Swiss-Prot record:
Organism: Shewanella sp. (strain W3-18-1)
Keywords assigned by UniProt, alphabetized: Cytoplasm, DNA-binding
Function, in words: Binds to DNA and alters its conformation. May be involved in regulation of gene expression, nucleoid organization and DNA protection.
SUPFAM superfamilies per UniProt: YbaB-like
HAMAP family assigned to the protein according to its UniProt record, in alphabetical order: DNA_YbaB_EbfC
Subcellular location: Cytoplasm, Nucleoid
Protein name: Nucleoid-associated protein Sputw3181_1707
Predominant cellular place of this UniProt entry's protein: cytoplasm
Gene Ontology CC entries for this record: bacterial nucleoid; cytosol
Top-level taxon: Bacteria
Amino acid sequence: MFGKGGMGNLMKQAQMMQEKMAKMQEEIARMEMVGESGAGLVKVTMTGAHTVRKVEIDPSLMEDDKEMLEDLIAAACNDAARRIEENQKAKMAEVTGGMQLPPGMKMPF
């Protein structure tokens, strides 16, 4: 099925892709994305590894009810996580040449 050179070349390509993916995963883990809610009144900065780095709350929200503020913080966190997922897919598509991961398979973070 494969000649000696063909199999060796295939293994070399697989190793190169694995190295590129590892490098890309490190890059993704270091990146930061900002999620927003309430038209920018609440902002959450999250790393590619889904660690929340910073929460910014507009002072005008401190006078409103606690439950609404909690909802806005949760929405901003979810927005940041969604942006990270989109960015990860785009970055990995660069490495894999647009080849999609199988459904349900996620990045190892």
